[in-house]
Design a protein with these regions (language model features):
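A short, proline-enriched helix->beta-strand linker immediately N-terminal to the Walker B motif
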Residues: 199-203
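Cytosolic ends of transmembrane helices, especially the final helix of ABC transmembrane type-1 domains
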Residues: 21-49
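Walker B catalytic motif
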Residues: 180, 209-210, 214-215
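Primarily ABC-family ATPase nucleotide-binding module
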Residues: 50-99, 132
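Helix-to-loop junction immediately C-terminal to a conserved catalytic motif
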Residues: 116
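ABC ATPase nucleotide-binding domain "signature" region
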Residues: 99, 190-197
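Conserved ABC transporter NBD signature motif
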Residues: 124-132, 141
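The feature captures the beta-strand-to-loop junction immediately N-terminal to the Walker
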Residues: 101-103
Length: 255
């Protein structure tokens, strides 16, 4: 009887042990099955973007000087069947600051990518200095567009603000009021982006959600300097306090 009990106990122990080993793979499989619908949507989005990339058209024109104006004329754009921009007409002119607002998925990033000619309208036309965007050589207009977001946060701070080493590290640190190191606070890092925008020689500046941790007095001072620069400044933000410094506000939900 004792031997039978030992066998039964050993069998039960092994049975429970192997069931426990199966638990994690089964849970992982279930999780992966639940993610299939969202993965499929992501895959469709990637394929749509690849298709968009392949349809870009370029010409031979060169950009002479700064970008003075940008016009979108009855632009339509969407991903597959999802229309993001419908009959969108906008005018951007140097010397003005434009606030771009709207919830996630409303088309803010799409609009920026269209202006940068990373996407191309499905209908309608985009003009740079009254010349069709697709008449310019590839990457020609990008020479005058400075996009500043938080996609560089893992880089060396000095490389972020001055990748071409035009200024000394000492000058930049004196201007900022703090030392450039790898332990910057969120506020210091975002102010670094603002400083980069102020130092840029390009004629179009796009600021994408870089204000949430910056002191309001510093933001006010930066926008005062932006006004003096006579450039096209496009500001993407959810901060209502920042919008008060813009000359006009573009609501993506109204387009």
């Amino acid at each position: 009887i004792g031997c039978t009990q030992n066998i039964n106990l050993s069998f039960i122990y092994l049975f429970v042990y192997y069931i426990d080993l199966l638990d994690d793979p089964i849970y992982e499989l279930r999780t992966q099955m639940e993610n299939i619908p969202s993965a499929k949507k992501a895959q469709e989005r990637v394929f749509a973007l690849l298709n968009i990339k392949s349809k870009l058209h370029f010409g031979t024109k060169l950009l002479n000087g700064n970008i003075c104006c940008i016009d979108l004329n009855h632009v339509h754009f969407g991903y597959n069947e999802n229309l993001v921009l419908k009959d969108c007409s906008l005018h951007f002119e140097n010397g003005n600051i434009y606030g771009l607002i709207g919830p996630s998925g409303s088309g803010k990033s799409t609009l920026i990518n269209l202006i940068a000619h990373l996407y191309e309208p499905q209908s309608g036309t985009i003009y740079i200095n009254n010349v069709g965007l697709n008449e310019y050589k590839e990457k020609e207009t990008l020479k005058e567009i400075e996009y500043i977001g938080q996609n560089e946060k893992n880089m060396n701070p000095y490389e972020i603000v001055d990748p071409y080493h035009r200024y000394s590290r000492e000058k930049i640190e004196n201007d900022l009021g703090y030392t450039l190191n790898d332990e910057l606070s969120k506020g210091q890092l975002q102010y670094l982006y603002l400083y980069k925008a102020l130092m840029s020689s390009k004629s179009v500046i796009i600021l994408d959600e870089i204000f949430s941790y910056v002191d309001m007095d510093k933001i006010k001072n930066a926008f005062s300097k932006f006004k003096e620069m006579k450039k096209i400044i496009i500001v993407v933000t959810h901060e209502k306090e920042v919008m008060q410094f813009c000359d006009s506000t573009i609501s993506m939900e109204d387009l």
